[in-house]
Amino acid sequence: MGHKIHPNGLRLGITQEHRSRWYASSKTYPTLLQEDDRIRGFIQKKYASAGISDVLIARKADQLEVELKTARPGVIVGRQGSGIEELRSGIQKTIGDRSRQVRINVVEIERVDADAHLLAEYIAQQLEKRVAFRRTIRMAVQRAQRAGVLGLKIQVGGRLNGAEIARSEWTREGRVPLHTLRAEIDYANKTANTTYGVLGIKVWVFKGEVLSKEDQPLPVGASPRRKGSRRPQQFEDRSNDGK
């Protein structure tokens, strides 16, 4: 079953968190769900070059909180936070409510090459540039291994290299335990529009096992912070706190 079901859906509440965090009645639930879908579609289309991995949405009373996980936060934030205001007005226009309070948090992804969404996006871009799919997969695997992932699986399907008959090919490096629920599996799928047709891309990344507090070993000592290493950037919007 672990090889057929969606890895993220199987692990919701265990190692994966919900992308939308809010409660609603049966009457307003469909409307809010459609709003979330429109917001994600607007952000992915407007900031296609920002390397956005995920968009998390939370609702509290009349306030809407949007958290963006991106590899290039500067593209979204802009100069002196001007991009945040533009994004806020765009979200309000998308949902059709200019008076809605929108709070935006931009979080930088610390390990870009260990993110399944960004790896799938990289593979799609290379395939659309007519790079051979085997070379593209090999380069993606090397980038993920340098990022320190424990396992990786990549599958590409379609008219590979312009072949007359569509087929699927995949490769795996390291461990990818899809049946282990405590395994932190990052999964993403992407489509590449080539001159020969559409290619489907699936990426599984194994980042380790999430242990409970009872199973975790006792810390012996904190490792010193390396010189020159910087913390991941995080921009938190507090413009609506006083309203």
From Swiss-Prot:
Alphabetical UniProt keywords: Ribonucleoprotein, Ribosomal protein, RNA-binding, rRNA-binding
GO molecular function list: mRNA binding; rRNA binding; structural constituent of ribosome
Highest taxon in the source lineage: Bacteria
Keyword set includes Lyase: no
A Pfam family recorded for this sequence: KH_2
PANTHER family: 30S/40S RIBOSOMAL PROTEIN S3 (PTHR11760), SMALL RIBOSOMAL SUBUNIT PROTEIN US3C (PTHR11760:SF19)
Record's function text: Binds the lower part of the 30S subunit head. Binds mRNA in the 70S ribosome, positioning it for translation.
Protein name: Small ribosomal subunit protein uS3
Annotated source species: Prochlorococcus marinus (strain MIT 9211)
